Design a protein with these regions (language model features):
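Interdomain hinge/linker at the junction between the two RecA-like core domains of SF2 helicases
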Residues: 1-35
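C-terminal helicase lobe
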Residues: 37-55, 61, 65-103, 107-178
Length: 178
């Protein structure tokens, strides 16, 4: 029913959603985006993947100047390293960050031109948090959806490693009721 529709007062009309979910060669696609040399955050779901993608992009990049602008970021880095990466990104020394959701919490950099969701977000809240990094200065910015069907399976695997499965929850519930 239309009378139940809620309009979000925080809609940012400067953001352009780019549906790239059909892309087969993600690294090649990212390499093309890297060549634009605009502030970009590529969000991934694991620390390992952040490191792997940063290395793959460096390996493919023929431009030494651009190669030095690529960096990975995750919560496992030392606090001093994270601060330095944030500072260098803010100042334009770095322009292409591959990160877990750690690069988003408490970080307000207005001129981020591209946010790439390489993997499927774990929740709507996380999606909004990550996508919301783009275009905070009011300029046109892009949110690129690069995830695919396999990412659903990856999320389920990652969640299963950190969350109890149904059988364990049932057993726990029965134990509480006994």
């Amino acid at each position: 029913h239309f009378d139940e529709l809620i309009i979000d007062g925080h809609i940012r009309e400067n953001l352009i959603l780019d549906d790239c979910r059909g892309v087969k060669e993600k690294i090649a696609w990212l390499s093309e985006l890297l060549a634009e040399d605009e502030k970009t955050i590529v969000y991934v779901n694991s620390r390992r993947k952040a490191v792997e993608i940063a290395q793959s992009l460096r390996d493919r990049c023929g431009d030494e100047r651009l190669k030095r602008k690529i960096c990975y970021y995750h919560g496992g880095l030392e606090a001093s390293d994270r601060k330095m990466i944030e500072k260098d990104f803010r100042e334009g020394i770095l322009s292409f960050i591959i990160s877990t959701s750690a690069f988003g919490e408490g970080i307000d950099i207005g001129d981020i031109k591209h946010v790439v969701l390489y993997h499927l977000s774990f929740s709507c809240e996380e999606y909004n948090q990550l996508a919301g990094r783009a275009g905070r200065n009011g300029e046109k910015a892009y949110i690129h959806l690069l995830y695919n069907e396999r990412d659903k399976n990856l999320n389920e695997l990652l969640l299963s490693e950190n969350c109890p499965n149904r059988e364990l929850l049932v057993a726990f519930y029965k134990a509480l009721r006994a």
